[in-house]
Amino acid sequence: QVNRYWQLFFGVGLVKSSENLGVQADAASHPELLDWLAAEFRDQHWDVKHIQRLIVTSATYRQSSKVGAELLEVDPTNKLLAHAPRFRLPSPLLRDLALASSGLLNPEMGGKPVYPFQPPGIWDGLSITKERDFTYPQAKGADLYRRSLYTFWRRTVAPGNMFDASTRAICSVKPSLTN
C-alpha cells in the first residue's frame, strides 16, 4: 500500500510495477525505504494520513524539479531521487485541481454518487437495448462541484471528462496519464 502512496506523489512507485509486488515483479529501487515506510504504516495503525504527511514533508518530496545538466548526466531517470519528479496528473485530480483553484470545489465528504456536467447525448447508445437506455440525471448546485471521487460511473463506460480512464473490467492501480 505504501508503494501506491509513494507513486501518487512521485509518479512512479518504489517498486515500478505497483500492481505486482511478488517475486516476479521489478525490484524495489530503494528497498530499505520501502520496508521502513511499510513498518511505519503498520506501527501507526494503518494511518494513511500519517504516511502521506510523512512523504510530503520529507526532504525528498520538497526538492525542486529543476534539473541541471550535470545532475541529468549522473541520474537521467531520477532513480536516486535527486530532484522532484515532473508528471501529469490523472484526469480526476486535474478536474479537482481546476475546481479548487477556481474556488468552486465542494469539500463535502461521503454520500451518494453525484452527476457533474456531461455533454448532452454522451451516454446515448451505450445501453444494450432501447428499454435500458440511460438518462443522465445531471446534478444541480453544489453537487456539480464535488470531488471526482464521488462521480457516477457506469460499469461499461467512464464519464466523458475522465479521459484515458481505465476500463472497469479489470482492476487498475496505475492510472494512465494523458500526454
Feature-to-residue mapping (PLM):
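Primarily short, surface-exposed interaction patches in extracytoplasmic proteins
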Residues: Q1-Y145, T156, G160-N179
